[in-house]
Amino acid sequence: KCMDAINEKLKNLKKLNIIVVGKSGVGKSTLINSLFRDKIAETGLGRPITTEIRKIEKKDYPMAIYDTPGFELSEGQQAKVKEEIIELIHKGLATGDINNAIHCIWYCINVGGNRTFDQTEINWLKELIEKNKVTKVPIIVVLTQACPKTKGKQMQTLVEKENLDIIKVIPVLAQDMDFDGEYVAKAYGLDQLVDIMSEALPEELQDTLQNVQKASLKSKKKRSRAVVAAASAVAFGEGFIPIPFSDAAVLIPTQITMIASITTNFGMNISKSVIMSFISSTIGTAGTTILGKS
């Protein structure tokens, strides 16, 4: 039953849909693969869903990335990308299905090397924000390759001074950066991006986010503690049912649900033997025996 509960939980995860926007070479694939498990950005080029946007997804994976072309395009193409993003948002909302909706937009700006503040990018973003006023899809500005941190912080301050209607500006270094073997700048910012995503997404997508993200163990633990607290509250009430010898059998379904939720949040692929071992340590040998027979 526990394995069935886990499989059912995984099957029922809502699909998280993210639009990722930015110039070519901004590091979108590195960002995606560093934040999410299974290296979704390496599953292929994706399939075109409009003339400018491609959808990257994987079978039995509860997330899709909508990738836009770089901004080294003509002014007309840039305008077309913007219109197609808004059209994609409206089409998803029109279905009334959360699995089809766009839940977040990442606007990626490369601040590495000798990159400087580009007002053209900010102006494009302002136009997108204006068109997004009705749909209000959360927008996060991700400053990629933000090394050194002082450079990322400076760019963050410049973008924040624009007073854009966005969720947050986050400097990120998605992978460790090696400087000729003499110094290694450690990756940072991915855990903060997960936290901001968690704040921006609805409750229906919280389990999905934790399932697919691999950058923040702290966030997974926080979500799992909430699951345990909820299960404990239910078990406390069930434990007082005045039926002789019923407690263990009554509690087990609650604990199965709890274990399934935690396993899903951690994105683990585990066997029945591992599950039974975990159950034995949490609800005891007697509970494992009852569960094994059911």
Language model features by range: what are they?
Residues D180-G181, E199-S219, P244-D247:
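C-terminal helical "lid" subdomain and adjoining coupling/linker elements of P-loop NTPases
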Residues V81-I167:
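Conserved C-terminal guanine-recognition region of P-loop GTPase G domains, centered on the G4
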Residues K1-M3, V137-I140, Q145-D207:
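Canonical P-loop GTPase G-domain recognition
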Residues K39, L73-S74, G113-T116, T150-K151, ...:
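Conserved protein kinase catalytic core
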Residues Y66-F71, Y107-V111, T144-Q145, I170-D176:
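Short loop/turn segments at strand-loop or loop-helix junctions that form parts
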Residues K1-G76, F266-N269:
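Conserved G1/Walker A P-loop phosphate-binding module
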Residues K220-S294:
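Small-residue-enriched, tightly packed secondary-structure blocks
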Residues A5-N7, K214-R223:
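Cytosolic juxtamembrane amphipathic/interface segments immediately preceding
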